[in-house]
């Protein structure tokens, strides 16, 4: 059972109950906290477009705790982040794996973060093909083109060579927050303020 917390705000006009995600959206915060599929992508894209329409100058904050998911759904989010005018700050909490790590790197340069104990995992796209030989060949060619595109974009976003990206994504490659910074996937590890 998936419980979504409710926040109650009191104003001079009375009380109003929000689900937590709607309340965070008021502060320009979007939470990607699940596997990425078409429904999740449509929700994230809609929120990005809404926040741009509300104020095209203020930054948007995308918090990521995701195991990854659909490449095409992830590209929908990635392209929207690149398309809209406001800078999108990306913050990894917990884990940004696979397409989650790709979206973490998609944030505005200088505004990509991870919390100290967060993990990042990069790898090549996964695919499965079945059917006749020609169908398998078509699927294999498609996944190779997708891998080339992902590697090229990751190279641009991290400053690593395409050859290094190919080698490092050949298998699941887990990075600490500090290693993700050294690799160029993020710009800073967020250190908690002393209390």
Swiss-Prot record:
Positions of disulphide bridges: none
EC number: 3.4.21.92
A Gene Ontology BP annotation from the UniProt entry: protein quality control for misfolded or incompletely synthesized proteins
Record flagged with keyword Protease: yes
InterPro entries the UniProt entry points to: ClpP (IPR001907), ClpP/crotonase-like_dom_sf (IPR029045), ClpP/TepA (IPR023562), ClpP_His_AS (IPR033135), ClpP_Ser_AS (IPR018215)
CDD domains, alphabetized: S14_ClpP_2 (cd07017)
Residues of the active site: 98 (nucleophile), 123
Main localization of the protein described in the UniProt heading: cytoplasm
Gene3D superfamilies in UniProt: 2-enoyl-CoA Hydratase, Chain A, domain 1 (3.90.226.10)
SUPFAM superfamilies per UniProt: ClpP/crotonase
GO MF annotation terms: ATP-dependent peptidase activity; ATPase binding; identical protein binding; serine-type endopeptidase activity
Subcellular location: Cytoplasm
PANTHER family linked to this entry: ATP-DEPENDENT CLP PROTEASE PROTEOLYTIC SUBUNIT
Subunit field text: Fourteen ClpP subunits assemble into 2 heptameric rings which stack back to back to give a disk-like structure with a central cavity, resembling the structure of eukaryotic proteasomes.
Physiological role: Cleaves peptides in various proteins in a process that requires ATP hydrolysis. Has a chymotrypsin-like activity. Plays a major role in the degradation of misfolded proteins.
Protein name: ATP-dependent Clp protease proteolytic subunit
Organism from which the protein derives: Staphylococcus aureus (strain MW2)
Lineage: Bacteria, Bacillati, Bacillota, Bacilli, Bacillales
Gene responsible for this protein: clpP
């Amino acid at each position: 059972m998936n419980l979504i917390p409710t926040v109650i705000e009191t104003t001079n006009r009375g009380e109003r109950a929000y689900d937590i995600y709607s309340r965070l959206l008021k502060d320009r915060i979007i939470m990607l906290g699940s596997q990425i599929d078409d429904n999740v992508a449509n929700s994230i894209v809609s929120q990005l477009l809404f926040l741009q329409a509300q104020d095209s100058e203020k930054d948007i904050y995308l918090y990521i705790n995701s195991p990854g998911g659909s490449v095409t759904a992830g590209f929908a989010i990635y392209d929207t982040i690149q398309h809209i005018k406001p800078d999108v700050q990306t913050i990894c909490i917990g884990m940004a794996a696979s397409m989650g790590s790709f979206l973490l790197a998609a944030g505005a340069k200088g505004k990509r973060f991870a919390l100290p104990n967060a993990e990042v995992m990069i790898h090549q796209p996964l695919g499965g093909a079945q059917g006749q030989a020609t169908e398998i060949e078509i699927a294999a060619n498609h996944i190779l083109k997708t891998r080339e595109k992902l590697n090229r974009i990751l190279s641009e976003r991290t400053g690593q060579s395409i050859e290094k990206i190919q080698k490092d994504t050949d298998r699941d490659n887990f990075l600490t927050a500090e290693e993700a910074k050294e690799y160029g996937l993020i710009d800073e590890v967020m250190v908690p303020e002393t209390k």
